[in-house]
Amino acid sequence: VGSWLEGGPSGEGDHGAGLGLAPSGPGSAAPLGRRALALVLDWTLSLLLASAFFSSSEGPFWERADPMVTLAVFAVENLLLVGTLGFTVGHRVLGLRVRRAGATPDGPLPDDGRAPGLGRAAVRTVLLCLVIPAVVWDSDGRGLHDRSAGTAIVRR
């Protein structure tokens, strides 16, 4: 018996098989519940930072921050942390990381454990901030932002 954070019902374990990801455990495709919760944590952190440092009004933190400033803080967090460390704060808390993923003529890219780099992180971040690419998935369970950047979110 698992929770929604552990992933979907059986039969969904083949997500990431085309990328050479493990079927379960570390290195396997991250379940949607964990990815969504990591996103909520990252957005909340961005909202807190934007309201603390870039607001001149009073009231609850979720009302003080300008939405575009919050989006900018979110984008900078994603770009720098994913590009250099391979995870955001939300990913780290939920045991996830972003890895390079894709195919070569010899098969799937091996996981070298390194962060995706700033170039891949920039593509991923721009598309993530546009929202629509992030909610359209391929057969491996990756959003179009990850597919376009050549990345995948996996369990640590």
Where are these regions (language model features)?
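Membrane-interfacial and juxtamembrane segments of integral membrane proteins
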Residues: V1-R156
